Regions:
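Mixed-charge interfacial surface used for oligomerization/domain docking
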Residues: 2-98
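C-terminal non-catalytic interaction/assembly regions of soluble proteins
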Residues: 68-160
């Protein structure tokens, strides 16, 4: 439990929605945004975000997410992080890769290295387009634990 609490203190995630989630029991969108807007900071279960802005490029989106995360968990030159770019279910892999490229580029400029990046669909929402970025500030113990094999519905790591 102590290791999990230490990890939790070093992890931050921020999501961007390009379309709302539709919960099957309700049958309607959980929030509304226009076609040229994005919901910033929305929840994985379709909860509305903290603000709505005009649609941004993948590079602008990556910068916005990383800058917002770093206001809450500052990173310094020499730090090492794991980055997860999670597609919410209706976002093409190419878009996820573009956002990752920008996040990696910005971290590299800050002399922060990336360990075991993850790009794909890990936790999705019904009919939602968008993505989330998770930054996990690592120490040697966390790096060792990340190398362990894992197999769950949301995450598989085949390392041995």
């Amino acid at each position: 439990a102590d290791t999990a609490q230490r990890a939790l203190a070093q992890i931050r995630t921020m999501g961007i929605a390009l379309s709302p989630c539709i919960v099957p029991e309700v049958g309607k969108p959980t929030f509304h945004i226009e076609d040229d807007e994005m919901e910033i900071g929305m929840g994985i279960h379709g909860e509305p975000g903290i603000q709505v802005e005009k649609m941004k490029t993948a590079d602008e989106t990556g910068r916005l997410i990383l800058e917002t995360i770093q206001r809450d968990i500052p990173l310094e030159a020499g730090d090492e992080v794991s980055v997860m770019v999670n597609g919410l279910g209706a976002t093409p892999m190419e878009e996820l890769l573009l956002v990752y490229r920008q996040v990696h580029r910005l971290l590299d400029e800050q002399k922060v290295s990336v360990f075991m990046p993850h790009i794909g669909e890990y936790a999705t929402s019904m009919e939602m387009a968008g993505l989330s970025v998770t930054i996990f500030k690592l120490d040697e113990e966390f790096k060792e634990l990340m190398r362990y094999p894992a197999s769950t519905p949301f995450y598989t790591n085949a390392n041995k």
